[in-house]
Amino acid sequence: MADTVLVDSTLIGVSLDGTQTPVFYDSHSSQANNGGNVTTFTGTQGSGKTMATEGVMVADGYKRKTVFGICPKGDLASIAELNVQLGGHWVKDDAGTIMSRGPLGVVRVWDLSASESVGALDPMRLSGRREDQMELLVGMLQIIFDDGATLTRNVMATVLAYAQDMLDREPYPSLTILTRTLSHAPDESVRVIGKTLSAISQTSFGRVMFAPLGSTAKPAVSEASGTIIATMRGVALPASKPKNDEERVSVALLYVLAWYVRYLMFRLPVEVKKTLVIDEAHMVTKTEQGRDLIHNVARMGRSRNVALLLASQRASDISLSDNNGEGGIENAFAYRFQFRTDKKEAAKFVKDAGLPEGEGYDSAIASFPGGKGRCIMVDRFGKPAIIDVFIPQEWLDVFGTNPEEIRARRKRAASQAK
């Protein structure tokens, strides 16, 4: 039997099973011992899951891991302020982006709702590889035109041919240039695609995927280092599969963002420990393209030294099984943290985690106190424990997610940055 590889774990709480004992966790400990690389944090709003997710990200920042958080609502962005509260300070980079520098290293908030983010995630600009550009374009189009009636196989082939031609002749290709070409195509069915994309380019979040004509700028974030938190405040969050145009655009943007973050992390040397955190993960997993992306990180992450942390309100939202509910990559799970939820969802978690049914785990989960950080933790061996996650009160004060508090923090950071 191989020796256990020891890692620099962090105290995250205490076990409530019998005698209280300390509980340690590290996002890379499982894969360091040939286990899975995926940790999940699930529970209803106010249950403590976001608090626990932030605590793990802070611990990884202290350990100088490269951490990239995707957080549509912006809850995780408070880590940048915590870095200041811990003794750091606000700074601005050459582009005027505000970040904090302190005990957690550099913590940067990439606000995709800001006016400066127009064209920041143009799928034709994120990689110089033709295969990547076409993969991104196909995935984005399939999410936006998901009914299959508008984007038929023949129409897709024509669109891709126009895209290939643009990539051949344009030194700075963009989705904007492609959209103009499609809008004037002789085929009416192709023009419909172009006109729809043109309308999307005028929306608050759609414009993030369309680089302005004449722009030669690279993405604002061109490499992963320190802690980066991408936010999309105000984005439409579908409860399940996106049902309207606004939700489809939001999910398409999130897919492009997640693809790009994976691209940046996989480019880093394997010796660098990397943590990818996706909050509201159901927005990614509810589409086939996003699910495939998550599966790829779960499969390939161990060889690239990437730990994947998924947070969502329901465990069933982020199951790693295939479309039929079986197979998939369930063995990629390293740890599961289940906070308070309703009894039906709790029963689903008990089954998915392989816990014995009929022993009251579902009732216990449903009765956990809200906001206290109480959860059931299942480790890579399938061993469960009810724990109270410990977060210092000073951190909790900063982690508050009240919208007015968040706006006040952003204003204060802007005034203090040098």
Task: Report residues per predicted region.
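Conserved P-loop NTPase motor cores
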Residues: 29-47, 51-59, 68-77, 113, ...
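P-loop NTPase motor core of the ASCE superfamily
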Residues: 124-173, 177, 322-418
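Structural signal for conserved beta-strand scaffold positions within catalytic alpha/beta enzyme cores
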Residues: 24, 108-111, 229-231, 338
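Basic- and hydrophobic-enriched, low-structure N-terminal and domain-boundary segments
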Residues: 1-42, 394, 417
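P-loop NTPase motor domains
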Residues: 2-22, 72-74, 81-86, 114-306, ...
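Walker A/P-loop NTP-binding active-site region of P-loop NTPases
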Residues: 47-121
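Short, conserved catalytic or adaptor-binding loops enriched in Gly and charged residues
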Residues: 95-104, 219-222, 327-331
